UniProtKB/Swiss-Prot annotation:
Binds 2 magnesium ions per tetramer. The gene is pheS. This is Phenylalanine--tRNA ligase alpha subunit. The keyword Magnesium applies. Tetramer of two alpha and two beta subunits. The lineage of its organism: Bacteria, Pseudomonadati, Pseudomonadota, Alphaproteobacteria, Hyphomicrobiales.
């Protein structure tokens, strides 16, 4: 056996005998380091004749490659063994009770939960979320939504007005999220499918009204939108939101400045118990308003009403939260009572999804 064969056998045996990566590294340095045994052999190539390089030189290179491959393979084996040993030492007793984390002790406010639920429903229908400022101009809050001069909503007793600016213009705390509809029409070409959740403000306060409350509106603009589309969208929403197999709805003629025709929508329910049950019973409850977007509103949004049409709807988030989860007093939403939040709040990690259950 030649000296190269002997060195090959010796090094491969040393590599196979290593039990950890430091020992393997020591073998590598002894063989392939600057003063390693294989490196010393490589230094002799310059003094060889051409014939010797073809035989002995090739054998030395083959030795180097064999040792390099063996080291790489052994390193992979040792790494896997180290991982397995660590995993074995880190075994967890899954029968132990889970300690409550700070995130688990906290609660999501019902309004935030309702917004997430509604977003999940309409996102599945292809809607996106639009937002706008809480402080609005008279133009976007009233004029662009077809409110005539002298309309009661423009009066001080119903709307929060700011003091006039240097130009005499008074801004308002928006009384609805509808201004975002006009802003979206100005900024985005049809087709448009949006929902608009947000805070709104009116001078009203009792068990079912608050000076600051939450609304969500929806808007669809295209060339073929019609009342049948409104009915389908709202029926599908109500079935999914109230988590029932079917709902019976009725549309009553109404009036809103920004829609024509306009409807109030009632849903059939059972109000005999402390919690309203939807999808059953013989009672009726109004839940939202809707209608076809008024041609004047389309014009204010920069759209031609002879080419485009649309429908819109709006509802109070606080009210439908009270209906769905049996909350008796709207004012409790804003009292920051930890006991109330513990009872009515939702766990932070239980995000509502259509496949997992909205209120699971």
């Amino acid at each position: 056996m030649s000296d190269i064969d002997q060195l090959n056998s010796s090094l491969l045996a040393e590599i196979a005998a290593t039990n950890d990566e430091p020992a393997l590294e020591a073998v590598r340095v002894a063989a392939l380091g600057k003063k390693g045994s294989i490196s010393e052999l490589l230094k002799t190539l310059g003094a060889m004749t051409p014939e010797e390089r073809q035989t002995r030189g090739a054998a030395i290179n083959a030795l180097k490659n064999a040792v390099t491959d063996a080291i790489a393979e052994r390193k992979s084996v040792l790494k896997m063994a180290a991982v397995n040993a660590r995993l074995k030492a880190e075994t967890v007793d899954v029968s132990l009770p889970v300690r409550s984390s700070p995130a688990e002790r906290g609660r999501i406010h019902p309004i935030s939960q309702i917004v997430d639920e509604i977003t999940a429903i309409f996102a599945d229908m292809g809607f996106s979320i639009a937002e706008g400022p809480d402080i609005e101009t008279d133009y976007y809050n009233f004029t662009a939504l077809n409110f005539p001069e002298g309309h009661p909503a423009r009066e001080m007793h119903d709307t929060f007005f700011f003091n006039p600016d240097e130009n005499g213009e008074r801004k308002v705390l928006r009384t609805h999220t509808s201004p975002v509809q006009v802003r979206t029409m100005e900024a985005q070409k049809p087709p448009i499918r949006i929902i608009i959740p947000g805070k709104t403000y009116r001078q009203d306060s009792d068990a079912t009204h608050s000076p600051m409350f939450h609304q969500v509106e929806g808007l669809v603009i295209d060339k073929k939108a019609n009342v049948a589309n409104i009915r389908w969208v709202l029926e599908e929403f109500c079935k999914t939101f109230f988590e029932v197999d079917s709902v019976t709805m009725r549309f009553r003629p109404s009036f809103f400045p920004f829609t024509e025709p306009s409807f109030e929508v009632d849903i059939q329910c059972d109000r005999s118990g402390p919690i309203v049950k939807f999808g059953e019973g013989t009672d009726w409850m109004e839940i939202l308003g809707c209608g076809m977007v008024h041609p004047n509103v389309l014009r204010y949004g920069g759209l031609d009403p002879d080419e485009y049409q649309g429908f819109a709807w709006g509802m109070g988030l606080d009210r439908i939260a009270m209906l769905k989860y049996g909350m008796p007093d709207l004012r409790d939403f804003f009292n920051a009572d930890v006991r109330w939040m513990t009872h009515y709040g939702f766990r932070p990690l239980d995000m509502p999804t259509l496949f997992g259950g909205l209120s699971a």
